[in-house]
Amino acid sequence: LQNVRANRRGWWSLWIFLTLFVLSLFAELIANDKPIVLSYDNELHFPVLFSYPETKFGGDFETEAEYRDPFVEEQILEKGWIIWPPVRYSYDTINLDLPVPAPAPPSTENMLGTDDQGRDVVARLIYGFRISILFGLVLTLVSSVIGVAAGGIQGYLGGRTDLLFQRFMEIWSGLPILY
């Protein structure tokens, strides 16, 4: 840690990475098409955590409430309030109210614009960052466990086992070069 701290760029990169990673762990609270919390008839509801039918908020259907629907939102606001996340889109929510055809340029509603299907780019970046980093961490952990186990077997048994494992690893490491 002291070596990283001595390098200013490395130190700031570490803090920026950790901040982005921690924020991405709470992606549902930052970018979601469901409210974080809402009050209806003096009852608190947490749509990010639980599913509620539309009938719970004065709607007609037993299906999960579509909170971005103007009718449902109006029903809730008549008898309560809603707290939305900063980005009102999830990674797969399509913005049907775009002023121009998708992909749309940045706007107040979509900070980095939308992709070719009308999905918010910021929301997709947040969720994608989390998936990519967690995948990398899990892959590193699994490969470390396999490597330590293989090295332990080679060291304990030695001889032909060690030779076979080494040849297998040499062939395995050469495979990416073939493609």
Regions found by a protein language model. Name each.
Residues 127-130, 134-138, 145-179:
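Cytoplasmic-entry segments and transmembrane alpha-helices of multi-pass inner-membrane transporters
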Residues 1-144, 148:
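Gly/Trp-centered helix-boundary motif
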